[in-house]
Amino acid sequence: MSKLHSQAFDISLDDEGYLLTLDHWNELVAVELASGENIKLTEAHWEIIRLIRKFYQRYQQAPASRALINYVRKELGSDKGRSVYVMRLFGGSAAKTAAKIAGLPKPDNCI
C-alpha cells in the first residue's frame, strides 16, 4: 500500500496506485494522480474523466477498453470515440489510467 501526499490531503492507494476509498476522490486528487502518470490534465482529459465516472455511477464498474471507447463514441461522438483519441490522452493503457485518475477501481479484464 502506498500513499498520495499533498498539502491538502494524505490518501491511501493500493499497490497499483488506485484509491482504496473511492469517496476520497476530488479534482485535486485527480490532478495528483495524473501527475504520477506524467499527465497534465486538459479539458479534453476532464471530459473523459467525467464520462468514465458517469459510466461507473450507472454500471458500478469502471469500463475496460472496448466499453470505454464505445461509451465515449455514444456520448461524445465518433471523433472522440476512437482508441487513438483516448490513448493520446491517457497512454497505451488508457482505460486503466483514466480509471485511476478518475478515482475508480481498476477495470475488469485489464492486465
Indicate where each model-derived feature is located.
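Amphipathic alpha-helical interaction elements
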Residues: 53-60, 78, 87
